[in-house]
C-alpha cells in the first residue's frame, strides 16, 4: 500500500522545521513535485487533537518529498530493476532514483509482486481545498478505497493543486486559472508515464504487472482533467487507464462534443468512462447560475454529444441515493459529495473499478442503453 502526492504547489520551509513542505498558498508553480505519505507511523488523532491550532501540515499526515532526479528518463530505473534481478551489475540502487522515477519504480515493484488486485487510483480533488484540507482528504480516501476490502484500490496518487480556501465567489475564477496550470502538470505526468512504459518494457526481461490504473475527478477537478486533455495530442495518447470516473463534474455539459476537443479524447485513453451525476446538486446549480454564464454542468445535467461513445461512456444518476455515511447539512443539502456520503454510491464505484459489466452492476435500474439510476 502506498499513497503519493503530485503537487504543483509552492515549496516552502516552515519556521523551525528542517524539511521542505508544500505551501497552503493559492499559488501554483510550473513544475510538480512528488511526495510519499507516511502511514507506517500514522496514528488516528482524537477529536480534541483535531481542534488544536497546530493540527496542520505534517501533524495531520507526515509525508516526504522525493528528491529531483539527477537524470531525465527512466534508463536508471531499468538499470536498478535489472540489477535487482541479477541480470545486470550496477552500483545504482533505488535510493539513486528521484521524482517520478522513484514513484514508478515503487509502484511497479509493489504491483508486480502480487497476483491479487493491486490497482492505482489517480484522484483529482475539486474546489475549496488548501493543502491541509488535501491531507485530510487523503486520509478519507485511504479509508474508503484502500482499507475497504470491497475496493480493488491498493495505491493512491493524489493530485494536489492550489484550489482556493475561500468561499468568496470570485475565488472560483482563481481556481479556474489554477486548474488550467495544474492540468499542464497532469499532462506531463501522463507523458512521463508513457515514456516509463516504453523504456522499461522494451526490455524483455521485465514483464508488465497486469494491474489497473483508474482516474477519478471530482467537481472542479474535472477542469484540471479538461486542461490536460486540451493539451494532449491524439497521436500521443495510449490507452493506459482502465476506469475513468467523473464525479459531480463542474464542467460544461458539452465537454464530450468534438468542438470542445477535450473529453472526447477520453475514449482513446481509457477502457470505460462513468459520469456520476446528481440532478439536485446545489453546488453545481450555484456554479451554473453565478459563475458559468448559465452553462449547464455535466455533473448535474448530464452530457450532450456522446452518441458515438455509448459503448464505453455511461451515465449514473445518483439523485435518489441516501446520505447514510455523512448526513450533516453540508452533504444532505449540497448533494455534491456522494462518493463520501453515500454507501450506495461507493458500492457502485467499487463495482465499476472491478470492471463488472455495466449491465450487471447491482442496485441499478437501466433507463437507456447507457444511462442508469442507482436505487434509493
Residue ranges and their predicted role:
Residues 1-88, 127, 135, 149-211, ...:
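Lipolytic serine-hydrolase domain surface
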Residues 85-117:
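Acidic, polar low-complexity linker/tail segments
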Residues 91-99, 137-146, 299-306:
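Short, mixed-charge, low-aromatic patches
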Residues 106-162:
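Short, surface-exposed "cap/lid" segments of acyl-processing enzymes
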Residues 141, 225-228:
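Hydrophobic packing residues within well-ordered alpha-helices of enzyme cores
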Residues 186, 217, 221, 225:
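Gly/Ala-rich beta-loop-alpha elbow adjacent to hydrolase catalytic centers
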Residues 214, 218-219, 245:
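Residue in the alpha/beta-hydrolase core beta-strand immediately N-terminal to the catalytic nucleophile
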